[in-house]
From Swiss-Prot:
UniProt entry keywords in alphabetical sequence: Cytoplasm, Lipid A biosynthesis, Lipid biosynthesis, Lipid metabolism, Lyase
Gene Ontology MF annotations: (3R)-hydroxyacyl-[acyl-carrier-protein] dehydratase activity
Class of this enzyme: lyase
HAMAP family: FabZ
Name of the protein: 3-hydroxyacyl-[acyl-carrier-protein] dehydratase FabZ
Signal sequence extent: none
Keyword Lipid biosynthesis (UniProt): yes
Organism: Ectopseudomonas mendocina (strain ymp)
Protein purpose: Involved in unsaturated fatty acids biosynthesis. Catalyzes the dehydration of short chain beta-hydroxyacyl-ACPs and long chain saturated and unsaturated beta-hydroxyacyl-ACPs.
Annotated family: Belongs to the thioester dehydratase family. FabZ subfamily.
Length: 146
């Protein structure tokens, strides 16, 4: 498990763009991670998306999955951003949205390592709420030295 303080060591993002609240399962040997994002009505994006019928923007669900995948990548490599390495989200394949994410939901983020080649990493990701899949995608990240 990782609390928010340890997560901040592995992700360079900060409020309001840090979208992983807690890591509940991290299996470096099995190359997978499970984390949570607690979705509050106080999220700044709900002011405009949409005030009368708030739903979490899909691009932020994708970003949350990418951040969970980034933590897994850092842990697999045994490095942190402070060591001079970053993972940039560069694309996705097989992206599907299945259900809206609403204020009060707890988003479960899962990522599994698929491959890496020439500093391009691929992860199979999914996001669920109460066990129901709301989004899935293959997330592609580029590893870059600073």
């Amino acid at each position: 498990m990782m609390d928010i303080n340890e997560i901040r060591e592995y992700l360079p993002h900060r409020y309001p763009f840090l979208l992983v609240d807690r890591v509940v399962d991290l299996d470096v040997e099995g190359k997978q991670i499970r984390a949570y994002k607690n979705v509050s009505i106080n999220e700044p994006f709900f002011n405009g998306h949409f005030p009368e019928h708030p739903i979490m923007p899909g691009v932020l669900i994708i970003e949350a999955m990418a951040q969970a995948a980034g933590i897994l990548g850092f842990k697999m490599m045994g490095v942190k951003p402070a060591d001079g390495t970053l993972y940039y989200f560069v694309g996705s394949d097989k992206l599907r949205f299945r259900s809206p994410v609403l204020p009060g939901d707890q988003l479960t983020l899962e990522a599994k390592y698929l491959s890496d080649r020439r500093s391009i990493w691929k992860f199979e990701c999914r996001a669920t709420v109460d066990g129901k899949e709301v989004c899935s995608a293959e997330i592609i990240c580029a590893e870059r030295k600073l």
